UniProtKB/Swiss-Prot annotation:
Residues 1-25, 91-180 are annotated as: Disordered. Residues 23-92 form the H15 domain. The keyword Mitochondrion does not apply. Belongs to the histone H1/H5 family. Histones H1 are necessary for the condensation of nucleosome chains into higher-order structures. Binds calmodulin. Transmembrane segments: none annotated. PANTHER family: HISTONE 24-RELATED (PTHR11467:SF36), HISTONE H1 (PTHR11467). Keywords: Calmodulin-binding, Chromosome, DNA-binding, Nucleus, Phosphoprotein. This is Histone H1. It comes from Dictyostelium discoideum. The gene is H1. It comes from the Eukaryota.
Length: 180
């Protein structure tokens, strides 16, 4: 009986060691972000999805491709993805699920931007204290405020430019349809 007792705890210890938590999100999330990133009308190919995931996530290279193939098959069977020729697209359900998963992620960058804005407001007061000339700090303080305003305008322009790009893509497709 003595030898049997030690074998049981070693099995439990081995079982706990064999299940490390992955450092990446689920395959469904990774695949949907890869497809949404490319925004192709015909969908994204499997090699493109693999390339995006390997570049952006820390995945185990030995089992990654087989797990990805199985995940793609599972998502097509589930209805989250649709297969078009050799490409994969997000279905309507998949788009809703993807946006639901990105909801909390979109809130986090907003918090980061507020942190960076507080850092930028903290930086200008530090610069006038270093400068000894009394006339220059007032002029430079005004220039820093204009710089922060310009930075805010630039960020607004960036968001506007992003919103204009999809509209520009839609317009040529409508013209092509009109020519037919």
């Amino acid at each position: 009986m003595g030898p049997k007792a030690p074998t049981t705890p070693t099995k439990k210890a081995a079982a706990t060691k064999s299940k490390p938590k992955p450092n990446h999100p689920t395959y469904q999330v990774m695949i949907s972000t890869a497809i949404a990133h490319y925004k192709d009308r015909t969908g994204s190919s499997q090699p493109a999805i693999i390339k995006y995931i390997e570049a952006n996530y820390n995945v185990a290279p030995d089992t990654f491709k087989t797990q990805l193939k199985l995940a793609l098959k599972r998502l097509v069977a589930k209805g989250t993805l649709t297969m078009v020729k050799a490409s994969y697209k997000l279905s309507e359900e998949g788009k809703k699920e993807h946006q639901a998963t990105l909801g909390p992620v979109a809130k986090k960058p907003k918090a980061k931007t507020t942190a960076t804005s507080t850092e930028t407001t903290a930086a200008p007061p530090a610069t006038p204290t270093k400068k000894a000339a009394p006339k220059k700090p007032a002029a430079k303080a005004a220039s820093t405020s204009t710089k922060t305003a310009a930075a805010k305008k630039n960020s607004a322009k960036v968001t506007k430019a992003v919103s204009k790009k999809p509209a520009a893509k839609k317009a040529p497709s409508k013209k092509v349809a009109a020519k037919k």
